[in-house]
A protein has these predicted regions:
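Cationic, glycine-rich low-complexity segments
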Residues: 38, 42-71
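Mid-length scaffold segments of soluble, non-membrane domains
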Residues: 86-165
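Membrane interface segments of multi-pass transport proteins and intramembrane proteases
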Residues: 60-78, 130, 141
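A structured, mid-to-C-terminal "fold-capping" secondary-structure block
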Residues: 23, 30-35, 147-260
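Bacterial N-terminal signal peptides
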Residues: 8-16
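Alpha-helical scaffold segments that form or flank carboxylate-/histidine-based iron centers
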Residues: 45-46, 75-82, 105-115
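Sec/Tat signal peptide C-region and signal peptidase I cleavage site
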Residues: 18-22
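Bacterial N-terminal signal peptides that target proteins for export
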Residues: 1-7
Length: 260
């Protein structure tokens, strides 16, 4: 049980660093859409305290780990990122369908099939070269937003980081919809799908954590720049998080700084 909690914590703390991916593109699109969805700051004192704890842990543990990961050869890091993105497609597909984005769902299915087979379990990305470009990842929180659910309260959780009421519900939905989660948590599925039951629930968090480490390593400079230029880092990250979520719901592009 303790080991499981540690694995979840590692994954979640890395995941919260993905806030740096939010860009400013899509703001005009948001205005044109007439969206009135705004997240309320319900527990600011608590959220700021949890933000400080999470940020301290990131600087002490997770940023150094990301720097160590960056020391690996670029082809290894690129292949690792491709493989985790490929598995992430299995969550995107059902959410594409639930959002009525059937064309995107078909594109994602094609990408997964090509990259899993020709691309050797997703290590390489031949699908892009064949015209099936990555159209973005989807999750159940985005699906709820497409369905019209408001963000609700914004708050920061210990370990899990920033979220909204809608995205917190989305986290549960993600586990229900993600085939990777079910394969690693159900021995009967493992026997039928992969021929053995050597996988465990820990594999799910290893996979998620690996993807998050890869993302953190790509965005070290982005986060450092944001921290150096923000008067109130908590407020800046809150704004970027909420804007990024809106952009993703609208399927508008956001800017992510990366480094091989």
């Amino acid at each position: 049980m303790i080991r499981k909690f540690i694995l979840i914590s590692v994954f979640a703390l890395f995941l919260q660093t993905q806030l740096v991916s939010a860009g400013t593109e899509g703001s005009e699109e948001l205005k044109k859409s007439g969206s009135k969805d705004t997240a309320e700051e319900c527990f600011e004192g608590f959220s700021r305290a949890m933000f400080k704890v999470n940020h301290t842990l990131d600087k002490a543990i997770f940023k150094p780990v990301a720097k160590g990961y960056r020391a690996l050869p670029a082809p290894i890091r690129r292949g690792t990122g491709n493989a985790t993105d490929n598995l992430r497609s299995l969550l995107t597909i059902p959410n594409n369908l639930l959002q009525g984005e059937f064309g995107r769902a078909g594109n994602t299915v094609a990408r997964f099939g090509i990259n899993t087979s020709v691309g050797i379990l997703g290590i390489f990305d031949p699908a892009t070269q064949l015209g099936f470009e990555d159209q973005g990842k989807e999750d159940f929180g985005q699906t709820l937003g497409v369905w019209g659910a408001d963000s609700g309260c914004y708050f920061v959780l210990p370990i899990l980081g920033p979220t909204t009421a809608r995205d917190a519900v989305g986290m549960v939905g993600n586990m229900l919809l993600d085939p990777v989660y079910h394969i690693t948590h159900n021995s009967e599925i493992q026997n039928g799908f992969v021929g053995n039951d050597n996988y465990s629930e820990h594999n799910y968090f290893y996979y998620q954590g690996t993807g998050a480490v890869d993302f953190r390593a790509k965005n070290i400079e982005s986060f450092d720049s944001l921290e150096e230029n923000s008067i109130d880092l908590y407020a800046s990250l809150k704004s970027l998080y909420l804007q990024n979520r809106k952009q993703k719901i609208l399927n508008s592009k956001s800017t992510v700084e990366t480094q091989d």
